[in-house]
Amino acid sequence: MIQVSRWMTKQVLAVEVNDSIGIARRVMAKHRINQLPVVTGDKLIGIVTDRDIRDAYPTSMLIDRAKEIDRFAESYTVEEVMTFNVVSVQPDTPLVTAVRLLRRHRIGSLPVVKKGKLVGIITRSDVLDFILSGRSLKQVSHRKGQKRQSGRP
C-alpha cells in the first residue's frame, strides 16, 4: 500500500503562530501556494489559507489601496485568522485515505505530522504527481493483502 510519506512534500513552508498575515501573504505569493501550516517551533498549531487572509480584510480595503492593505496585514497575526482544528495525517497513512480526506473536507492540503511534529505536507498537486506516475489509487487500495502476479508490481 502506498503511504503518504512516499509522495508528500518534505521541505514544508510554514509560518509561526505570531507571524503577521503580511508575512504569510508574501510567502504564499512568492511560492505560489494557497495555504501554510502554522507552527510553534516544529509543532503543528493550525493552518492559514489565502482565503483566511482575504476574509480578514475589510471589504472597502480590497479596492486597490495597497499601502492600507500592507499596513493592515502587518497589524494582525496569523493566529488571529488561522484554522485551529486542522485535518492532518501521519506519514504511514495510506495515500488513498489522504485523498478521501482532501475530498471530504474540500481542502487543498493535509499537514503530515509525527508525534505532533510537522514532517511534511500532502497536497492536491502531490496527488496529481502520483496519478501522472501511472499508478492508480484503485489498484493500490484493492491490492492490499494480495500477492503480486507474474512479476508485475
Mark where each language-model region is.
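Tandem CBS (Bateman) regulatory domains
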Residues: M1-Q11, T49-V87, V99-R103, T123-P153
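A glycine-centered beta-loop-beta connector
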Residues: M28, L36-D52, L102, L110-D126
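Glycine-/small-residue-rich active-site loops that bind phosphorylated ligands and cofactors
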Residues: L13, S20, I45, V87, ...
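Short, charge-rich amphipathic segments
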Residues: A29-P37, A56-P58, I63
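Non-transmembrane, interaction-prone segments in cytosolic or luminal domains
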Residues: S20, D42, L62, R71-T77, ...
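The conserved cystathionine-beta-synthase
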Residues: V15-R32, V39-T40, E79-E80, S88-R106, ...
